[in-house]
């Protein structure tokens, strides 16, 4: 896993959470 991938994953998680709400 690359640092960039981790950042993207974190942002994706946030977007997913926001969308779920």
Swiss-Prot record:
This is Hemocyanin subunit 1. Hemolymph. One of its GO terms (molecular function) is oxygen carrier activity. Coiled coil: none annotated. Belongs to the tyrosinase family. Hemocyanin subfamily. It comes from the Eukaryota. GO terms for cellular component: extracellular region.
């Amino acid at each position: 896993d690359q640092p960039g991938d981790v950042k993207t994953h974190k942002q994706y998680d946030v977007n997913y959470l926001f969308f779920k709400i």
